[in-house]
Regions:
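Sec-dependent bacterial lipoprotein signal peptides
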Residues: 1-20
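Tryptophan-paired
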Residues: 87-123
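Short, ordered, surface-exposed loop/turn motifs in non-cytosolic proteins
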Residues: 74-88
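C2-type phospholipid-binding modules
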Residues: 131-177
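Solvent-exposed strand-loop boundary residues in beta-sheet-rich modules
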Residues: 39, 88-92, 133-135
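Bacterial Sec-dependent N-terminal signal peptides
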Residues: 15-44, 48-58
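Short amphipathic, basic-aromatic surface patches that mediate peripheral association
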Residues: 57-76
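Eukaryotic beta-sheet cores, primarily in C2 and C2-like/PH beta-sandwich modules
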Residues: 84, 111-147
Length: 177
């Protein structure tokens, strides 16, 4: 019994000594561990080596929280048939283009699931909200647009982006891995 206790105490001391010596080596060498990838919300500009703490944002859902309540179609008292597109500002192609939600109630949150959970980078993204003309009589109406940087403005799994006129709010939900 005493031998088992002594071995346990010795094991704890060896582990503690090993852990403290690693920390001491880092402090003595002047190296700072951290995430060195600017596309991670855990990025540290003072890190001198990557210690494996990087995580990245992957989009899960797009949410239209509010938008201007006006008649977008030729018929009176018809709610908008909404769809949204999202892309990196520097890109010519859309990374997400939603299906159309017909007669969307402006007082109800509209949600689109991301068909593929692509990584959101530390760049400016733009979104555009449209009213689809059903049946297609003329071009779809541009309702609102906005921009966001998910790494800079993401908080607790959500990026909130407001249109330039402040009447439309889009939320991009993400998970970290």
């Amino acid at each position: 019994m005493i031998k088992t206790v002594n071995i346990s105490i010795l094991a704890v001391l060896v582990i503690a000594l090993g852990a403290s010596s690693c920390k001491k080596e880092d402090e003595e060498s002047g190296e700072t561990g951290g995430c060195m990838d600017v596309n991670s919300p855990h990025y540290s500009s003072s890190a001198t080596y990557d210690n494996g703490t990087c995580e990245f944002l992957y989009v899960t859902d797009y949410e239209l929280t509010s938008y201007e309540d006006i008649d977008w179609d030729l018929l009176i008292n018809v709610d908008a048939d909404v769809y949204i597109k999202v892309k990196r500002q520097s890109s010519s192609s859309w990374e997400f283009s939603s299906n159309t939600i017909d007669n969307a109630d402006p007082n109800t949150v509209q949600i689109w699931s991301a068909p593929n959970q692509f990584q959101l980078l530390n760049e400016t993204y733009v979104w555009e909200l449209f009213d689809a003309d059903n049946p297609p009589i003329d071009e779809d109406d541009a309702m609102a647009s906005g921009s966001f940087n998910p790494v800079a403005s993401g908080n607790n799994g959500v990026v909130v982006s407001e249109s330039s006129d402040g009447l439309t709010i889009v939320k991009i939900h993400y998970s970290l891995h």
